[in-house]
UniProtKB/Swiss-Prot annotation:
Species of origin: Rattus norvegicus (Rat)
Residue ranges occupied by any SH3 domain in the UniProt entry: 12-71
Protein name: Osteoclast-stimulating factor 1
Comment field on protein domains: The SH3 domain mediates interaction with SMN1.
PROSITE patterns, per the entry: ANK_REP_REGION, ANK_REPEAT, SH3
CDD domains: SH3_OSTF1
Origin: domain of life: Eukaryota
Cited SMART domains: ANK (SM00248), SH3 (SM00326)
Length: 214
């Protein structure tokens, strides 16, 4: 009986490493990579040979080589977002690194993109169908809190247009509006809160009207 094919790796389970040395393949199945290259490991079902991708090429790598001769990158998407490194971010997403993964602070890559003012990164993350806008980190801050606090009105506008919530409070009970450090951010947030408030009021009135008509 032939061995069943390995299960596909779920997004977010991809392991990412930076090669410390160049690896010269001995067979056509093996993956060539150079010192400093980023390697995405997608299949670790075989304990001896792992399947990986590097610079768009896929092949096998001895697992002991990766363990001993490569440096693990725990949150590559976060690192790319923090640095504003668009090409690396795209590469991570292409290699199925999970878009909503959390770092030790409980923050997403989107949070760090907003914190750093990297609008182009935010726009690419928004192309991911399941991107989580309202994830709160260990301090209770969302991506909207970060953008407002750092004063990036263009990013605040992007987040609001995408549907980010303005009513979430952090651990200090502060809304994104309370964190806004400039008038442009505050104005956008006030306007959105007023719109949301009016919509909530309208929904409540509709509900009461429906009850009256029963």
């Amino acid at each position: 009986m032939s061995k069943p094919p390995p299960k596909p790796v779920k997004p977010g389970q991809v392991k990412v490493f930076r090669a410390l040395y160049t690896f010269e393949p001995r067979t056509p199945d093996e993956l060539y990579f150079e010192e400093g290259d980023i390697i995405y490991i997608t299949d670790m079902s075989d304990t001896s040979w792992w399947k990986g991708t590097c610079k768009g090429r896929t092949g096998l790598i001895p697992s002991n080589y990766v363990a001993e001769q490569a440096e693990s990158i725990d949150n590559p998407l976060h690192e790319a977002a923090k640095r504003g490194n668009l090409s690396w971010l795209r590469e991570c997403l292409d290699n199925r690194v999970g878009v909503n993964g959390l770092d030790k602070a409980g923050s997403t890559a989107l949070y760090w993109a907003c914190h750093g003012g990297h609008k182009d990164i935010v726009e690419v993350l928004f192309t991911q169908p399941n991107v989580e806008l309202n994830q709160q980190n260990k301090l209770g801050d969302t991506a909207l809190h970060a953008a407002a606090w750092k004063g990036y009105a263009d990013i605040v506008q992007l987040l609001l247009a995408k549907g980010a919530r303005t009513d979430l409070r952090n651990n200090e009970k502060k809304l994104a509006l309370d964190m806004a450090t400039n008038a442009a951010c505050a104005s956008l947030l006030k306007k959105k809160q007023a719109t949301d408030g009016a919509r909530t009021l309208s929904n409540a009135e509709d509900y009461l009207d429906d009850e009256d008509s029963d």
